[in-house]
């Protein structure tokens, strides 16, 4: 027997065909969210306060200090926040100390700082009752970047950009004449020597001595002449810079100093962030530039005076290892003194080393570095500017490297914590202004911290971020895999990122550094391709936001691949050679072959085993979680694998899910980490189980009670339902799955079912990827899912009195009210159809003055009931089902309702959706299709033993698509079902051809795994043997019930008076320009006329036509379409006097409908201004919904 048994969780054993030992398990798959937020609460939040405080007043007599903060217990639990449409958040209290420097008086006070959103255990936030999450953002890292440019004449030159986290950019560039320029914050350029002079190096000789002679430097100095002898060179340079930054303003050297300090050297205005300083020091450090160069001076140990490395030595990795500690300790450091009128007249520490130029072995080049400033230094320093210029000049000599901006060493992840930290910082900086003003304007005696602080800017900033940021998204909750995938997603779009329209192919493309960090497969199709990506399965994010991938260290001395795992960032990995995960190893963990396939800076090379530094930990570290759930992924074309991974995320949870016979071994951990399953918080013994709760007695004796979620509506309108998995008396460990979530079975992800599939054509019904299905799948509810829709009705106070929820509704018979309770709300369990009442509601109508006759009648018969109109909530088209839950919120019960709302009723309707013709289905290999025919079981082809086939797929869907994985899954699935075993075939390390055929043979199937099929209608065998097997098929969220739609009497657009479009607006089908051409070509004049008039926007004509049909008269001639009148009005608004003439050249009156002219609806009732208002509201709502849909599509 091939393969070995592996236990996944407590409830499933699979036969695994993996051959590679994995030395490390998968990390917790949502830690990218949870760790970031935890870090924010532990450190990030306090750091922002420490950055912003203390705040002084303008006179410097008072100071407000930050002492600390405390988070109190949340007002609502997660479930309560969901039910009440509230936020899951905790009040935060910050302690401030106000110091009066004149009197020495201290006032300490705790200030309420608003409610701060809390993250749930699943990595999400509850915002207004719905579950949202913050998608991480992939952005350019702050740092120092160099690039190569080629102009149109083919001349190469180098450029440089310093990108801060916050603040002005600093750029260096060369023009066609070979002169170097500097640009400050994208303004006009200046010679770069001007910047050096401003830093205090006034004379040409000082600059040449500092940087060494190069062609670029001497040419630039020649161009940079002393224009105004009255100023020193430093002052003239300062004025030149001021003139560029503030053109037209009077310039002085002092104002320029102040401006330059504010632009680059002031921590309030300029910030590198720790990551920027780390990248900067790393780029400019001498140790990272010396490899492969020849030294032009000896390296001497400063303590002993011993010469460690002689002149003319080539710096190899071993030499570098020897001198690296000395360079870190300041070898080659020297101090230069700028002139007294410099921007910052303080000594500058630099580090230097002399080497020979690679382009001219006689030339000595001095490399300068910034002396490695401390990581606390978050601003640019003069040493940084000088060493940047030195590096830039060195590039022309062939020293140093240009940067690739798409390299993952230069792009970093901003996770939840950092994004929130930035929002708090924005809020605090707005607040700081207010505090300063209040400090200055208030009387000193009675001022308190509470009186100074207005928290609104901070709370508004956070609210805005959660409500409307591009990165705050409505969680994709189709199934647990889509939840998990959404939490691990990161986007290059959003504030501070790139825009979809400007994104080049290079940004979107797969880069070699994505290996083990970002999935090359899972990305959306369409305009966002390559801009939205997923984290690879083993990847982690380090403290600076760079993605790390794990590797096994190779002990090169002994030639052993150790089990020690190191996480490397992309730029660290560039220094090493990494062997592939499938390199054969001996029993004592040595490479079995003399040579191994390895990667080095993007090249796949065969190297001697002794030169490999690391080895991959697992073959599936390359790809993301969704792609790792596709068996035989290695046999699929990547485009189809992309579709397969994306479509698994659209699977609908079924009533009775089954895990796949052929899995990849990822199903268990995906289910556990998704947050949809119920996990044991502590080890213990199960004491009680029912459908609603599980009680576990801990080993310490305490009792844990777990509530099970039943049939809750998910964000996507699917049913979120948990089923107990633990049994009475069972021992459970911490983090064991004790209840399956939606789309789970026995603790494993179960997105679909395992039907019997045949690749064959049948009467042409599976043309173009269509799917033919057996009636059995409907009868046995194999692909039945539950959709839950939520409807709400609220009563408000109107000008004419309050609205009311009641059974007493005008003009409604008893039959329609039979399912409403005494208060007018539908009962739970009622079966409702389209148009049925859910909540009876009446709104007061404006009354006219009664006539004398009416007054007399009222006097005789008492006060008549007030005039009300029916505004009840009814079931919309296609919304019928069973009332599953009703929730009533009122002020009396202490529920928080929006202002003006007195009562809110929510009704949940559940629909059992069996699979229909028109529903979309898919396998896991991108093989998608629409159900085209549902055939009775007796007509389906059957196996020799009489078993009917469940699904027929078109064999033409395989060859051109090159997703052969589906065929391998089919054969192995049949063998697995016959043997009654579940199989795991991990990605890139799964069952080989031999394994498949051995298993097929073990199951007693035919050698070619095909079979004879018999036609169910005739009993005759089909001509050829047919591939039949078990394939995992999923039903997708694109269900025909949500899309089928037909208009009867519906709303019209207010301006053009044409029918609205779209299902949400109960709109019509657009008869567009091309369709009109078709009718014109056909000569169908009457059809064309009524389509352009009665059926569209001839307001009077359509009303008259309706009346004529009702009365059985001839339909009158159509009038003028409303849109024509709109066109005429638009032309008149341009000042063109346009008149419309009839055949006799009489001017037609395009008068507007008068108020008193009766407009009637097709049902002959009068059109009132309220109706027009309501219609206007419907149109506005429709447009808003359409915009929301478009935005949602864009997000996808």
Swiss-Prot record:
CDD domains given in the database record: RNA_pol_B_RPB2 (cd00653)
SUPFAM superfamilies: beta and beta-prime subunits of DNA dependent RNA-polymerase
Keyword hit for Ribonucleoprotein: no
Keyword Electron transport: no
InterPro entries: DNA-dir_RNA_pol_bsu_external_1, DNA-dir_RNA_pol_su2, DNA-dir_RNAP_su2_dom, DNA-dir_RNAP_su2_hyb_sf, RNA_pol_bsu_bac, RNA_pol_bsu_CS, RNA_pol_bsu_protrusion, RNA_pol_Rpb2_2
First-tier enzyme category under EC: transferase
Gene Ontology terms for molecular function: DNA binding; DNA-directed RNA polymerase activity; ribonucleoside binding
Catalyzed chemical reaction(s): RNA(n) + a ribonucleoside 5'-triphosphate = RNA(n+1) + diphosphate
GO biological process: DNA-templated transcription
Family matches, as Pfam families: RNA_pol_Rpb2_1 (PF04563), RNA_pol_Rpb2_2 (PF04561), RNA_pol_Rpb2_3 (PF04565), RNA_pol_Rpb2_45 (PF10385), RNA_pol_Rpb2_6 (PF00562), RNA_pol_Rpb2_7 (PF04560)
Family label: Belongs to the RNA polymerase beta chain family.
Name of this chain's protein: DNA-directed RNA polymerase subunit beta
Originating species: Lactococcus lactis subsp. cremoris (strain MG1363)
Organism ancestry: Bacteria, Bacillati, Bacillota, Bacilli, Lactobacillales
């Amino acid at each position: 027997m091939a393969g070995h048994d592996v236990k996944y969780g407590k409830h499933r054993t699979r036969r695994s065909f993996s051959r590679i030992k994995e030395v490390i398990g998968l990390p917790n798959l949502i830690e990218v969210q949870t760790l970031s937020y935890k870090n924010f609460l532990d450190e990030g939040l306090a750091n922002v306060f420490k950055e912003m405080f203390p705040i002084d007043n303008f006179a410097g007599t008072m100071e407000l200090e930050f002492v600390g903060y405390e988070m109190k217990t949340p007002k609502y639990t997660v479930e309560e926040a969901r039910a009440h449409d509230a936020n899951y958040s905790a009040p935060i209290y910050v302690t401030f100390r106000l110091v009066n420097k004149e009197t020495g008086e201290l006032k300490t006070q705790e200030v309420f700082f608003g409610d701060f959103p809390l993250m749930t255990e699943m990595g999400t936030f509850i915002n207004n009752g719905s579950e949202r999450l913050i998608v991480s953002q992939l952005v350019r890292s702050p740092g120092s970047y160099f690039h190569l440019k080629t102009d149109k004449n083919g001349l190469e030159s180098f450029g440089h950009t310093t990108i801060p986290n916050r603040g002005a950019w600093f750029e260096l560039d060369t023009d066609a004449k070979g002169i170097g320029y500097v640009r400050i914050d994208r303004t006009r350029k200046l010679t770069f020597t001007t910047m050096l002079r401003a830093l205090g190096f006034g004379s040409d000789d000082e600059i040449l001595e500092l940087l060494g002679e190069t062609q670029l430097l001497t040419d630039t100095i020649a161009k940079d002449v002393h224009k105004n002898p009255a100023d020193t060179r430093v002052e003239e340079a300062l004025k030149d810079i001021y003139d560029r930054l503030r053109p037209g303003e009077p310039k002085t050297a002092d104002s320029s100093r102040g401006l330059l300090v504010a632009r680059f050297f002031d921590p309030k205005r300029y910030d590198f962030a720790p990551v920027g300083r780390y990248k900067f020091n790393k780029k400019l450090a001498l140790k990272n530039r010396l490899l492969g160069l020849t030294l032009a001076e000896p390296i001497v140990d400063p303590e002993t005076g011993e010469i460690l490395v002689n002149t003319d030595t080539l710096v190899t990795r071993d030499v570098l290892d020897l001198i690296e500690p000395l360079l870190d300790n300041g070898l080659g450091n020297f101090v230069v003194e700028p002139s007294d009128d410099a921007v910052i007249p303080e000594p500058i520490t630099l580090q230097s080393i002399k080497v020979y130029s690679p382009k001219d072995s006689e030339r000595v080049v001095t490399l300068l570095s910034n002396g490695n400033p401390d990581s606390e230094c978050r601003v640019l320093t003069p040493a940084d500017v000088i060493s940047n210029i030195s590096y830039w000049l060195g590039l022309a000599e062939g020293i140093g490297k240009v940067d690739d901006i798409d390299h993952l060493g230069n792009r970093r992840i901003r996770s939840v914590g950092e994004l929130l930290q930035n929002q708090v910082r924005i809020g605090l900086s707005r607040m700081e202004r207010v505090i300063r003003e209040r400090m200055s304007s208030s009387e000193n005696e009675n001022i308190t911290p509470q009186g100074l602080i207005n928290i609104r800017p901070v709370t508004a900033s956070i609210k805005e971020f959660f409500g409307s940021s591009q990165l705050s998204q409505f969680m994709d909750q189709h199934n647990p895999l889509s939840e998990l995938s959404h939490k691990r997603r990161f986007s290059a779009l959003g504030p501070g990122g790139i825009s979809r329209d400007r994104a080049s192919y290079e940004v979107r493309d797969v880069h070699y550094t994505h290996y083990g960090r970002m999935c090359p497969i899972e990305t959306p199709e369409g305009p966002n391709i390559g801009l939205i990506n997923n984290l690879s399965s083993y990847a982690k994010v380090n403290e600076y936001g760079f993605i790390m991938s794990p590797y096994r260290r190779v002990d090169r001395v002994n030639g052993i691949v150790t089990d020690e795992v190191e996480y490397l960032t992309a730029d660290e990995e560039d220094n090493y050679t990494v062997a592939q995960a499938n390199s054969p190893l001996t029993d004592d963990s040595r490479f079995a072959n003399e040579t191994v396939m390895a990667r080095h800076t993007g090249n796949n090379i065969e190297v001697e085993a002794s030169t490999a530094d690391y080895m991959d930990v697992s073959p599936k570290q390359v790809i993301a979680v969704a792609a790792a759930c596709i068996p035989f992924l290695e046999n699929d074309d990547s485009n189809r694998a992309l579709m397969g991974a994306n479509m698994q995320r659209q699977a609908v949870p079924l009533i009775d899910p089954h895990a796949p016979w052929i899995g990849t071994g990822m199903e268990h951990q995906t289910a556990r980490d998704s947050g949809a399953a119920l996990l044991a918080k502590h080890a213990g013994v199960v004491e009680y189980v029912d459908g609603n709760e599980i009680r576990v007695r801990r080993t310490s004796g305490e009792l844990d009670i777990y509530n099970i979620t039943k049939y809750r509506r998910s964000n996507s309108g699917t049913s979120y339902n948990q089923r107990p998995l633990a049994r009475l008396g069972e021992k459970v460990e911490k983090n064991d799955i004790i209840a399956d979530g939606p789309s789970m079975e026995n603790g494993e992800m179960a997105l679909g079912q395992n039907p019997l599939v045949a690749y064959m054509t049948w009467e042409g019904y599976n043309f173009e990827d269509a799917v033919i299905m057996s009636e059995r799948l409907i009868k046995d509810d194999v692909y039945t899912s539950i959709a839950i829709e939520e409807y709400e009705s609220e009563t408000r106070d109107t000008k004419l009195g309050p609205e009311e929820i009641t059974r007493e509704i005008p003009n409604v018979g008893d039959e329609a009210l039979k399912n409403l309770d005494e208060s007018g709300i539908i009962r739970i369990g009622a079966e409702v159809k389209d148009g049925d009442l859910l909540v009876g509601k009446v709104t007061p109508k404006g009354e006219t003055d009664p006539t004398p006759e009416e007054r007399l009648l009222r006097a005789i018969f008492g006060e008549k009931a007030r005039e009300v109109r029916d505004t009840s909530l009814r079931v919309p088209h296609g919304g019928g089902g069973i009332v599953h839950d009703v929730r009533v919120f009122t002020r009396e019960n202490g529920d928080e309702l929006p202002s003006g709302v007195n009562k809110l009723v929510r009704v949940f309707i559940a629909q059992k959706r069996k699979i229909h013709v028109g529903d979309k289905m898919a396998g896991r290999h991108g093989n998608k299709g629409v159900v085209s025919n549902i055939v009775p079981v007796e007509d389906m082809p059957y196996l020799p033993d009489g078993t009917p086939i469940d699904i027929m797929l078109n064999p033409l869907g395989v060859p051109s698509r090159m997703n052969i994985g589906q065929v391998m899954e089919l054969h192995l699935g049949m063998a697995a079902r016959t043997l009654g075993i579940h199989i795991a075939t991990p990605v890139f390390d799964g069952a080989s051809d031999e394994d498949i055929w051995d298993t097929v043979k073990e199951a007693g199937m035919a050698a070619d795994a095909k079979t004879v099929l018999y036609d169910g209608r005739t009993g005759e065998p089909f001509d050829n043997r047919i591939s039949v097997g078990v394939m995992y098929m999923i039903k997708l969220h694109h269900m025909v019930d949500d899309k089928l739609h037909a208009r009867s009497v519906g709303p019209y657009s207010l301006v053009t008076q044409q029918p609205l479009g779209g299902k949400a607006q109960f709109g019509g089908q657009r008869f567009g320009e091309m369709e009109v051409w078709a009718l014109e070509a056909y000569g169908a004049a009457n059809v064309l006329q009524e389509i352009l008039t009665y059926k569209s926007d001839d307001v009077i004509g359509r009303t008259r036509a309706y009346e004529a049909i009702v009365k059985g008269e001839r339909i009158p001639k159509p009038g003028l379409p409303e849109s024509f009148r709109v066109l005429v009005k638009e032309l008149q608004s341009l000042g063109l006097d346009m008149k419309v003439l009839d055949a006799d050249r009489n001017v037609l009156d395009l008068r507007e409908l008068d108020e008193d002219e009766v407009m009637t609806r097709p049902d002959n009732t009068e059109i009132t201004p309220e109706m027009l208002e309501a219609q206007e509201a419907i149109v506005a709502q429709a447009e808003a919904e359409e915009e929301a849909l478009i935005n949602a599509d864009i997000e996808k």
